[in-house]
From Swiss-Prot:
Family: Belongs to the thioredoxin family. DsbD subfamily.
Regions of this protein lying in the Cytoplasmic compartment: 197-227, 273-292, 353-365, 415-425
Name used for this protein in its record: Thiol:disulfide interchange protein DsbD
InterPro entries linked: Cyt_c_assmbl_TM_dom (IPR003834), DsbD_gamma (IPR035671), DsbDN (IPR028250), DsbDN_sf (IPR036929), Thiol_diS_interchange_DbsD (IPR022910), Thioredoxin-like_fold (IPR012336), Thioredoxin-like_sf (IPR036249), Thioredoxin_CS (IPR017937)
Source organism (scientific name): Haemophilus ducreyi (strain 35000HP / ATCC 700724)
EC number(s) stated in the UniProt entry for this protein: 1.8.1.8
Membrane disposition: Multi-pass membrane protein
Gene: dsbD
Length: 573
């Protein structure tokens, strides 16, 4: 059974790696988004569409089609096009290098938008049509406030992953089932992995272990609580915006959850037992014929808490579903996409828990050791939560302390009678020494006159408002600009700061542009104005602006990227 469990787990990881490899394969031709870089700006009462066309590629004039929703589209005048003998369509009018297209719109009503369809080719290869939907700024009706319309407000672009997912949902509802597969891939990310010890402790870590069918029911119930909460929170964020997400990540909420998980871990150590009131307990026992640890209601509630913990993590699939809800207002399809995404995130948890329930022994002293081990693992959740609000330099000490406590318990609790077990003990002592590195390094730094050189953090100009951003974009005319939207409670934002922005090659690449950062932690009025202007649905979000101060919407980043991934992204600018 153990062999089958590891075979299944290896297969899941292999599928994820194969998927990643497939997406990383570089095609012979540029992607459509790379060949035809689209951007738009709304200013001076007019909408400007712009395509930067790669060398050797071209756009068909006849395939550029515009349609307005809740607005009236004026006559569109194209610049002079080049006549070209196309091997597919005969003589056609095309555009090379770049195309700037002014568009006049009037009679803008509630939630106006413009849909743009275009198609291009290169020698020997033709692309399918691309579609972009742009939310329109009411200032296009004649409000000449330069400040209110000087910046683009669109995020829907052909090659932004979240936008492609949103468009796929709009064009084909069957693509919704792809979110289930995307969720499985997200299950192995830092936002979801902390859910495993909580579920495993509930199903495996109590006295009378359930049978396989009962373990499946409990784990499925847990995932349902997590998925439904994740879905409802996602729809709420799409409807209300970032303020709701900020509220969930406030210090009071995070500290409360951390205290709860610490108490649960203490109960796993046998310090006390968590029991419901007797009347509730009797009813739950009658329904489930299990002790309190296995009650379905309890497990569902813990799943809800897990959904709260996982909710702030922004990824391209999550952003795509939220973007679809925000643009279409279709709560049913958007909610189902969010549910399938969360369900996919929970499937590996179900499999690991059910197989672990079968593999681990169900009685004897080993059971108490397993329960204590899960208590240590559960203590990782408070650290995961508290690290969002503590300065980053405290986090290594928290993890080191937990690892030292766990290894110390493991060394003292195992029986070392054979030569093999003695070797294991030596390895554990070595691991104990390695995990003490943050504390040893702290002592060394306080007693040594020479500190080890560290990689400097990326220098960023701090801004606080949309008005200040406009001023900076004007000041940096002729230079590309990057804007990082950061919050203390955003885990992936801290990962960018720690792992990506400290990379020397990343810093060298960013040295050619102006790098700005705005702190969204407090969700001030200035934060809200900027967020609404750019239609930001979650963090982390990184925006890029060209030399003229227009956002390059096709390269907007949502979700964490490693240094290598970020460098590849920058090469597309």
């Amino acid at each position: 059974m153990l062999k089958r469990f590891f075979l299944l787990l290896s297969s899941l990881l292999l599928v994820c790696n194969v998927q990643a490899g497939l997406f990383n394969n570089k095609p012979q031709y540029l992607t459509a988004a790379e060949a035809f870089i689209f951007s738009s700006s709304q200013q001076d009462g007019q909408l400007q569409l712009h395509w930067q066309i790669a060398d050797g590629y071209y756009l068909y004039q006849k395939e550029i089609q515009l349609s307005a929703q809740n607005a009236t589209l004026g006559d569109v005048t194209f610049p002079t096009a080049e006549k070209y003998q196309d091997e597919f369509f005969g003589e056609v009018a095309i555009f090379r290098d770049q195309l700037k297209l002014p568009v006049k719109l009037t009679d803008l009503k509630e939630n106006p938008s413009l849909k743009i369809r275009y198609q291009g080719c290169t020698k020997g290869f033709c692309y399918p049509p691309e579609t972009v939907v742009i939310p329109l700024n009411p200032s296009l009706q004649g409000n000449n406030s330069a400040n209110s319309a000087a910046l683009p407000s669109t995020i829907a672009t052909p090659n932004a992953p979240q936008t492609e997912l949103a468009e796929n949902l709009s064009n084909n509802y069957l693509s919704i089932f792809g979110f289930l597969l995307l969720g499985i891939g997200l299950a192995f990310t830092p936002c979801v992995l902390p859910m495993l010890p909580l579920l495993s402790a509930i199903v495996i870590g109590h006295k009378n272990r359930p049978n396989t069918s009962r373990a499946l029911l409990l784990s499925f119930t847990y995932v349902q609580g997590m998925a439904l909460t994740y879905t409802l929170l996602g729809l709420t964020v799409a409807a209300i915006g970032l303020p709701f997400q900020v509220a969930l990540q406030s210090p009071a909420v995070l500290i409360s959850l951390a205290v709860l998980f610490t108490l649960l871990a203490a109960s796993m150590f046998g310090l006390f037992e968590i029991r419901l009131p007797n009347t509730w307990q009797q009813k739950l026992n009658a329904l489930s014929q299990q002790q309190q640890g296995g009650a379905v209601g309890n497990v569902f509630i813990m799943g809800i808490i897990a959904g709260l913990v996982a909710s702030p993590c922004t990824s391209a699939p999550l952003s795509g579903a939220l973007l679809y809800v925000a643009q279409s207002g279709n709560l049913l399809i958007g909610g189902l996409a969010l549910y399938l995404l969360a369900l996919g995130m929970g499937l590996p948890l179900i499999l690991i828990t059910v197989f672990g329930n079968q593999i681990l022994p169900k009685s004897g002293e080993w059971l108490f050791k397993v329960k204590t081990a899960f208590g240590f693992v559960m203590l990782a959740l408070p650290i995961f939560l508290i690290s969002r609000i503590l300065p980053s330099h405290y986090e290594p000490f928290l993890w080191s302390t937990l690892a030292l406590a766990f290894l110390g318990w493991l060394i003292s609790s195992l029986n070392y009678s054979t030569m093999l077990k003695q070797a294991v003990r030596i390895l554990l002592f070595i691991a104990f020494g390695l995990t003490a590195y943050p504390w040893a390094n702290l002592v060394w730094q306080t007693t040594s006159n020479t500190a080890q050189p560290t990689t400097p953090h990326l220098a960023m100009e701090k801004i606080t408002s949309l008005t200040e951003l406009e001023q900076k974009l004007t000041a940096y005319q002729g230079k590309k600009v990057m804007l990082d939207l950061y919050a203390d409670w955003c885990v992936a934002c801290k990962e960018f700061e720690k792992y990506t922005f400290t990379d020397p090659q990343v810093q060298q690449q960013l040295a050619t542009m102006a790098v700005l950062q705005i702190d969204m932690t407090k969700n001030s009025a200035e934060n809200t104005a900027l967020m609404k202007h750019f239609n930001v649905l979650g963090l982390p979000t990184i925006l890029f602006f060209d030399e003229n101060g227009h956002e390059m919407t096709n390269v907007r980043i949502t979700g964490f990227l490693t240094a290598n991934q970020f460098l590849a992204w920058l090469n597309r600018l």
